[in-house]
């Protein structure tokens, strides 16, 4: 891979490519091929948000979110557009929860169910600071992570963070051998089972 970068693009990577276990890639970025050119890592806030009477979170297996730096200035129109984005069939989320973090206040779409201190604690758990916006999705764990990944990439695109001339190569390792498909109700090999076998499989 380094040879191809060097010969085709004239880019020489001196350091070894980063390696990330599959489960870490999924939990931090929602993808088995994560874009590492920018941050916006995911955070599990399930335990922080359950038990407050908000059924969407109380009934969910998993609640996760990320902080988008500088996005507290997003207008209602921009937030609504992102909500419609995640509700598209291609993404499949039922809605989007947001937290606007300012120096002296926090505002969220679920203020009815949480105190300002509770909302701020969730925002801080997602790594947010003043001037940031936090976006949260909930549902089955890996479905929510995948949906949040689509949102992460969309927000990064809007912020100009996905520079096609910048590269952040990595190897994702330790893939599960099989994955379950809800539609066909059966297991499928996640990748060709003989390309990178593990002894425990």
PLM features per residue range, with description:
Residues 1-201:
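Class II aminoacyl-tRNA synthetase catalytic cores and aaRS-like
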